[in-house]
């Protein structure tokens, strides 16, 4: 159980982290006439003005350590401070099912994860554990703050603006919203519109994985906001895919830190879990 919670917490953190970072045409006739590359660029530009959104995400990977599948829902506020609240509804790692319903909160540098009752002995009975994003970055040797700031619909859509084969497929209703469907591929050499740091991270990922391109399907509403994004990658060691459904753009929601008396320090739980895993 201890190991399963540790893996589940990591999966929930990865899900939330991976998701938190020119106006479009107003009628069907104009939208149909906009070239695919221009429409994708408009979507990236329009989404950059968004303050908050909700996303339901399903991610899956095959092959070795990457064999996993998870589904969750996250509400994210990008401005003025990064805030998010999410639930990991289900997760499977290397064929092992993990507890569902795990809740997590992100407030600036602070990440809170709900502790299953079975593990309350390691937290003094407290139901929440708190981690620092900046401290975790130092321990992992990775700038998680930078990754979080880039992990938003605008940056994700911007990746596909360099595609040389993007094309319009047709129209489709996504959760009651009429959208135009675009599809295409992008390679590490075609991400020139990203900043230097994002380009380097993108290229390094594909060098390590052995992948040479990403296949994407993007559904964009009349307001030039993405409503659905599906990405697929085939690499040397397996495959990966993700499906994201976006909604509730610029809608307000409440999120606050758990009461201080119900929170334990993440290092305490980390040490306890570590001793149980050896």
Located regions from the model:
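Generic alpha-helical scaffold signal
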Residues: 13-16, 105
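Subset-of-secretome marker
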Residues: 2-6, 23-278
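C-terminal motif of bacterial Sec signal peptides marking the signal peptidase cleavage site
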Residues: 18-21
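Sec-dependent N-terminal signal peptides
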Residues: 4-14
């Amino acid at each position: 159980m201890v190991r399963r919670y540790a893996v589940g917490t990591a999966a929930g953190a990865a899900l939330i982290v991976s998701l938190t970072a020119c106006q479009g045409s107003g009628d069907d006739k104009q939208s149909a006439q906009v070239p695919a590359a221009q429409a994708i660029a408009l979507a990236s530009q329009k989404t950059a003005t968004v303050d908050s959104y909700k996303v339901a995400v399903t991610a899956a990977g095959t092959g070795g350590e990457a064999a996993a599948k998870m589904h969750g829902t996250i509400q994210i506020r990008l401005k003025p401070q990064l805030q998010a609240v999410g639930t990991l509804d289900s997760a499977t790692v290397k064929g092992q099912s993990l507890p569902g319903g795990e809740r997590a909160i992100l407030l600036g540098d602070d990440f809170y994860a709900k502790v299953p009752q079975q593990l309350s002995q390691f937290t003094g009975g407290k139901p929440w554990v708190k981690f620092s994003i900046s401290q975790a970055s130092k321990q992992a040797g990775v700038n998680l703050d930078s990754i979080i700031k880039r992990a938003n619909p605008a940056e994700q859509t911007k990746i596909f603006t360099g595609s040389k084969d993007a094309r319009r497929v047709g129209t489709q209703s996504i959760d009651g919203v009429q959208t135009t469907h675009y599809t295409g591929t992008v390679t590490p050499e075609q991400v020139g519109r990203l900043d230097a740091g994002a380009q380097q991270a993108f290229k390094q990922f594909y060098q390590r994985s052995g992948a040479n391109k990403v296949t994407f399907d993007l559904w964009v509403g009349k307001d030039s906001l993405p409503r659905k994004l599906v990405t697929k990658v085939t690499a040397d060691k397996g495959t990966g895919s993700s499906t994201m459904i976006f909604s509730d753009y610029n809608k307000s929601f409440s999120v606050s830190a758990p009461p201080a008396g119900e929170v334990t320090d993440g290092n305490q739980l980390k040490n306890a879990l570590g001793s149980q895993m050896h």
